Curated annotation (Swiss-Prot):
Protein name: Pantothenate synthetase
Family stated for the protein in its record: Belongs to the pantothenate synthetase family.
Molecular function (Gene Ontology), one example: pantoate-beta-alanine ligase activity
UniProt xrefs under Pfam families: Pantoate_ligase (PF02569)
NCBIfam families tied to this protein: panC (TIGR00018)
InterPro entries: Pantoate_ligase (IPR003721), Pantoate_ligase_C (IPR042176), Rossmann-like_a/b/a_fold (IPR014729)
Main location, first listed in the record: cytoplasm
Residues reported to bind (R)-pantoate: 61, 155
Gene: panC
């Protein structure tokens, strides 16, 4: 595995790979790798000749400085994992390489509408940071494919819009959420959970599933009551609820009666840890 820390060296390597007509797959990460990342790498291998994983803890997408400071930095462990799974290139740049003039003076890229709602409303500037670093990585690496998990569904949708509207010739491939046996969605932030919170956290997906089952069975006019009861149940379990509702699968607007494909999005706090999850539903009209 070739570890690259500068854009100049990365450009040189990409130029060689492009001349050889190699299909490049990109898996962007912030490190602290888990089984979800590994599944993305294995998926990338099915499509790509060359696998590039980036590790960059992007300060531009953090709305909380203490969250940025406390984010796990596990480069040695991560590099061992990436070597084990035969990743070709690890791009591990310093912050000054990505933002040489500082974040305050950085030109940014933003998908206007979707970046302002739901998670974007709760975390101002977060998605602007995501789309800016993803745009930079796409420009540096020029991948044929890029791989993202479906747990961060709003982020996935935003990146798909970014690719379409900026005319990138990149295929975005998503991976269904990877879960522990108890149903908890894998996330680097799960490391923040205390032992007691780890016992409570799986209830999030259990309640999501139950809610979806009820929504499918009941009439439209009962839906607000079902959502409200689920929020109360989450609060009783110890969660603080930020987002818990169903949205149009394509645009995250509140669904009209004609829309069949919807998604239940959940964003909650458990102690000091933010957990997000979702489940797709096909409504029976």
């Amino acid at each position: 595995m070739h570890i690259i820390k500068t854009i100049k060296v990365l450009y040189r390597e990409i130029k060689i790979l492009k001349k050889s007509n190699k299909k490049i797959g990109l898996v962007p990460t912030m490190g602290n790798l888990h089984d979800g990342h590994i599944k993305l790498i294995l998926l990338a291998k099915k499509y790509s000749d060359i696998i590039i994983v980036s590790i960059f803890i992007n300060p531009m997408q953090f709305d909380n400085l203490s969250d940025l400071k406390n984010y796990p930095k596990t480069f040695m462990k991560d590099s061992i994992i990436l070597k084990k799974y035969h990743v070709d290139i690890l791009f591990f740049p310093h912050i000054n390489e990505i933002y040489p003039n500082g974040i305050e003076h950085q030109t940014f890229v933003e998908v206007i509408k979707l970046s302002k709602i739901l998670e974007g409303q709760s975390r101002p500037g977060h998605f602007r940071g995501v789309t800016t670093i993803i745009t930079k990585l796409f420009n540096f690496i020029q991948p044929d494919f890029a791989f993202f998990g479906e747990k961060d569904y709003q982020q996935l949708l935003i990146i798909k819009i970014l690719v379409k509207e900026l005319n990138y010739m990149i295929k975005i491939i998503s991976l269904p959420t990877i879960r522990l046996k108890n149903g908890l969605a894998l996330s680097s932030r799960n490391n923040y959970l205390s032992s007691q919170e780890n016992e409570i956290a799986p209830y999030l997906y259990k309640i999501i599933k139950k809610t979806c089952e009820k929504i499918i069975k009941e009439d439209d006019n009962i839906r607000p009551k079902i959502i409200h009861e689920s929020k109360i149940l989450l609060i009783k379990k110890g969660f603080s609820v930020d987002i818990f509702d169903i949205y149009d699968y394509k645009n995250l607007e509140h669904p009209s009666k004609k829309v069949k494909k919807v998604i239940l999005l959940a964003s909650v706090w458990l102690g000091n840890t933010r957990l997000i999850d979702n489940k797709k539903i096909i409504l029976n009209y």
